[in-house]
């Protein structure tokens, strides 16, 4: 009986799915469809996040930032400075401008709005640390607080990159 039990256990272990297996994180086909709500206040907040993602991050139209960002724009990302002027200067200096901003091309998994908070969840691809040449996906998010009709505070799971 002991031998049979060991054989069954060995078979189960050999045929079980790897512990580190995962389902890939996949974006929706039409990300802009997620930035809507039947609730007018939540819809307005989601639209602010859409403008940030599309006009500012994707197309680098930072001259329009005052339409959507508060002057104080608090940054809880260790790689960014607080203040609208600082973020405008950084992105204007470091990224090229794209003229066609008709649709959001960034992959998005979900957009959640609750009260004054809006979260955009995105897939992110990483190099697998144990298997050279392989990639895996996980999630990334942006979270904003809306104050007086503008994005006022921002969080992201960013870490400080090594020099």
Indicate residue ranges for each PLM-predicted region.
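Short beta-strand edge/turn micro-motifs at domain boundaries
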Residues: 23, 139-163
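Short, cysteine-centered beta-strand-loop-beta hairpins and adjacent loop/turn segments enriched
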Residues: 96-101, 126-136
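A short hydrophobic beta-strand element
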Residues: 114-124
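Short, low-complexity N-terminal intrinsically disordered segments enriched in polar/charged residues
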Residues: 21-63, 67
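A solvent-exposed, acidic/Ser-Thr-rich amphipathic alpha-helical stretch
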Residues: 62-114
């Amino acid at each position: 009986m002991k031998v049979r039990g060991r054989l069954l256990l060995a078979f189960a272990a050999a045929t079980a799915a790897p512990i580190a297996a995962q389902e890939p994180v996949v974006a929706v086909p039409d990300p802009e469809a997620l930035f809507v709500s039947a609730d007018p206040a939540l819809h307005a907040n989601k639209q602010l996040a859409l403008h940030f993602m599309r006009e500012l991050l994707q197309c680098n139209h930072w001259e329009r930032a005052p339409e959507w960002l508060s002057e104080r724009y608090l940054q809880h990302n260790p790689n960014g400075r607080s203040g609208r002027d600082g973020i405008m200067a950084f992105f204007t200096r470091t990224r090229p401008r794209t003229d066609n901003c008709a649709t959001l091309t960034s992959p998005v998994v979900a957009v959640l709005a609750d009260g004054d908070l809006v979260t955009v969840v995105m897939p992110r691809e990483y190099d697998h640390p144990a298997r050279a040449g392989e990639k895996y996906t996980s999630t990334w998010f942006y979270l904003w607080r809306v104050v007086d009709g503008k994005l006022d505070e921002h969080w992201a799971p960013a870490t400080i990159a090594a020099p």
